């Protein structure tokens, strides 16, 4: 357990597509399998000590007694039950079971996190457990913060893509993939670090922990995470409240009531002052960004605030449409396209979120009212455990409960605008598990397993069954996803269209037949392979395989507009290569269906336009392009498509007018699309004998993509014709 809590926040592996969250998830799942196996072995020992009949007869009584003595544990089981039911009735049950990509919050994660809760609950009878747990969590926070400081001072030995930025500065993320997640973990760790410092007996150790706490607070502030700052404020308020609560509950004199809270607040005050001094000295480049970010906390018009509001609105509407069980555990991202707004697209441009960025709204959307009730029950029972433990007659338990309560309050505060990831959830579960035992520490007694003497034949059989079950669970939940992720990483090292890339994705898809991304990426690579092929027969075979891959992906995710848009593009290419009478009708059907399923996604609309254009269905393509241009007037692609259709129809003047607009608009990171627009514009100019403009347009295309053959030909032709005219 201690090793898990130490490693989960700091583990990352650069040889995986998801270098941070995926290895943490696999580590947590491995630990959970071991914990479940140990629990199963203990139960098999019970069976061996008596008999199967006696064990089954006693089981109902034991369960009733357990529920009465451990309401918090029963609440956690009830929440797991809600997650299980939402998984069974999910819009995508397999995804809910294993977790969505870039989210990893399925039933597998829920059960693994619950195992941490129950393991910590069982260890709470050991007086050293809280000290061990908080010490390793504080060490992990120090390591994560230390790596973040390297990033802050631009000393990171690794180069990372996809930085979150603000005010022109890269935001630090440490070992937790995103500044918000780093900030959330540090918020939880700070009260624990304060507690470790106050319990230290050596002055040198105490000072060392104070420095660690100050550095942690410094990093927390420089994450520029408003959610983490809110969590810090909530944690601070909870700390003051709980210290005061403990003093009132245990003091008999007014003098002691006055002193106790003040004593408890000395170290946090020292940390705060030291951090402010360090921040002013060491990070002057962040001062303006800090001021601006703080001003955005209450600014409802800030883009990120508007983005959150859009996500919350979508989550509430999702919950209203699936009021009892939700759309399915971890299916927010899959259900989101039906609730996407044009305003959200303008803010985030084409992103498909996997979370609602508010824990309760996310639960409502994915688990319905049943999940919300179960989650609220757990929250209230944890609060009850904190409140009872801070009034304990044991001063050690009281102080530990104050730190735990403040950490969990910080967790709840950041969850108002964020979400839970593996490291944060595991620490919260461990603290809640300890509280579940601490509130009854003075009365609870261990429930020993009676020894049965030498292992019996039945015990050996039970042990073998447990081992086989644990091995099967480990292979299906850890080994296969890990192998598939490694294959995906190897695939990503090859260019799009490479047979090696395609085959690696195909092998990954065979390992995880419920995961549509592998089929999608195999299909995309096959499509590019077909486009690049000069042999019509080879191109046709690649297109057939691409179509099959996208059809497989659509069967896995029947709601996806993106997958259908790619399928329409492949069908359109097949129509061009080997025309059939029914081909264009099939392209039209799939393209229109794709847009109907994700009607405000500009990329889906764009892919549908291109597929319709490829099948020479210009009327339908033009209608979609005009619709996209009205929704997103700054987006270049629909203007380029309208211009390309005009060029193909021989309306060169109209093509020039529209393409000239397109090349000046926003391509949203698509330089190849812009290059093609310049190339088409050069063709239109040539047709109208505007050779100087044609040469300039062709050269603009070649600056973006020197390999465009038509642009090269247009440039040479324009130069030749200009020379002939002169």
Regions found by a protein language model. Name each.
Residues 178, 309-353, 360, 367-374:
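TM-adjacent membrane-interface loops and short helices in multi-pass inner/ER membrane proteins
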Residues 11-25, 45:
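Short, hydrophobic transmembrane alpha-helix segments
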Residues 281-298, 455-500, 517-521:
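Hydrophobic alpha-helical transmembrane segments in integral membrane proteins
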Residues 39-66, 84-99, 123-128, 156, ...:
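Transmembrane alpha-helix boundary signature
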Residues 1-12, 28-42, 75-90, 105-285, ...:
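Alpha-helical transmembrane segments of multi-pass inner-membrane proteins
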Residues 167, 171-173, 235-236, 255-257, ...:
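Flexible juxtamembrane loops connecting transmembrane helices in multi-pass membrane enzymes
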Residues 489-726:
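C-terminal luminal/periplasmic domains and tails of membrane-associated envelope-modifying transferases
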Residues 46-70, 246-262, 389-398, 442-458:
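Membrane-interfacial, low-structure loops and terminal tails that flank and connect transmembrane helices
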């Amino acid at each position: 357990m201690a090793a898990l809590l130490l490693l989960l926040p700091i583990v990352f592996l650069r040889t995986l597509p998801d270098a941070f969250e995926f290895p943490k998830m696999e580590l947590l799942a491995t630990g959970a399998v071991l914990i479940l196996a140990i629990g199963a072995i203990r139960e098999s020992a019970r069976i061996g000590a008596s008999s199967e009949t006696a064990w089954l007869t006693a089981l109902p009584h034991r369960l009733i007694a357990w529920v009465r003595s451990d309401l918090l544990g029963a609440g956690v089981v009830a929440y797991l039950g809600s997650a299980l039911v939402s998984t069974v009735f999910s819009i995508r049950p397999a995804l809910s079971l294993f977790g969505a990509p870039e989210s990893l919050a399925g039933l597998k994660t829920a059960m693994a996190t619950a195992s941490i809760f129950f393991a910590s609950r069982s260890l709470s009878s050991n007086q050293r457990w809280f000290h061990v747990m908080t010490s390793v969590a504080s060490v992990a926070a120090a390591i994560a913060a230390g790596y973040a400081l390297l990033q802050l001072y631009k000393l990171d030995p690794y180069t990372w893509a996809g930085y979150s930025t603000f005010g022109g500065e890269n935001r630090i993320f440490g070992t937790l993939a995103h500044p918000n997640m780093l900030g959330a973990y540090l918020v939880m760790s700070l009260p624990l670090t304060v507690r470790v410092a106050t319990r230290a007996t050596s002055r040198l150790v105490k000072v060392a922990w104070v420095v660690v706490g100050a550095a942690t607070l410094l990093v927390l502030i420089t994450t520029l995470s408003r959610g983490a700052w809110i969590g810090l404020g909530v944690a601070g308020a909870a700390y003051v409240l709980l210290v005061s609560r403990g003093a009132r509950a245990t003091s008999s004199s007014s003098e002691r009531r006055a002193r106790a809270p003040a004593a408890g607040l000395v170290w946090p005050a020292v940390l705060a002052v030291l951090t402010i001094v360090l921040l002013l000295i060491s990070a002057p480049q962040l001062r303006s960004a800090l001021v601006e970010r703080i001003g955005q906390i209450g600014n409802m018009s800030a883009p990120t605030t508007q983005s959150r509001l859009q996500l919350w609105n979508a989550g509430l509407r999702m919950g209203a449409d699936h009021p009892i069980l939700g759309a399915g555990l971890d299916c927010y991202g899959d259900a989101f396209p039906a609730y996407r707004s044009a305003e959200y697209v303008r803010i985030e441009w084409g992103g498909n979120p996997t979370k609602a960025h508010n824990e309760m709204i996310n639960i409502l959307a994915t688990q319905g009212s049943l999940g919300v009730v179960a989650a609220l029950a757990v929250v209230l029972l944890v609060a009850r455990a904190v409140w009872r433990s801070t009034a304990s007659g044991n001063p050690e338990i009281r102080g530990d409960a104050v730190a735990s309560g403040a950490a969990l309050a910080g967790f709840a505060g950041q969850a108002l605008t964020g979400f839970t990831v593996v490291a944060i959830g595991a620490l919260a579960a461990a603290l809640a598990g300890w509280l579940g035992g601490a509130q009854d520490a003075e009365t609870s007694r261990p429930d020993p397993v009676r020894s049965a003497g030498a292992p019996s034949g039945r015990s050996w059989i039970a042990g073998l069954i447990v081992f086989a079950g644990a091995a099967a669970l480990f292979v299906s939940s850890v080994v296969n996803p890990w192998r598939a992720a490694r294959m995906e990483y190897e695939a990503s090292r090859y260019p799009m269209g490479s047979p090696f890339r395609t085959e690696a994705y195909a092998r990954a898809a065979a390992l995880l037949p419920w995961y549509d991304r592998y089929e999608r990426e195999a299909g995309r690579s096959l499509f590019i392979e077909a486009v690049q092929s000069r042999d019509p027969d080879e191109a046709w075979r690649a297109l057939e395989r691409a179509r099959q891959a996208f059809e497989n992906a659509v069967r896995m995710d029947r709601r996806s507009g993106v997958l259908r848009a790619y399928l329409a593009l492949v069908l359109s290419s097949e129509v061009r290569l080997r025309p059939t009478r029914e081909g264009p009708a099939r392209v039209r059907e799939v393209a229109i269906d794709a847009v109907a399923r994700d009607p405000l996604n500009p990329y889906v609309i764009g892919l549908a336009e291109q597929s319709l254009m490829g099948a020479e269905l210009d009327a339908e393509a033009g209608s979609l392009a005009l619709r996209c241009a009205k929704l997103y007037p700054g987006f270049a692609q629909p203007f380029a498509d309208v211009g390309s259709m005009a060029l193909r129809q021989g309306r060169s003047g109209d093509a020039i007018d529209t393409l000239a607009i397109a090349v000046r608009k926003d391509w949203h990171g698509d330089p190849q699309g812009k290059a093609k627009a310049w190339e088409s514009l050069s063709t239109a100019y040539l047709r109208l004998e505007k050779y100087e403009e044609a040469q300039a347009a062709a050269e603009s295309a070649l600056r973006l993509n020197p390999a465009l053959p038509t642009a090269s030909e247009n440039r040479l032709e324009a130069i030749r014709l200009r020379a002939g005219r002169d």
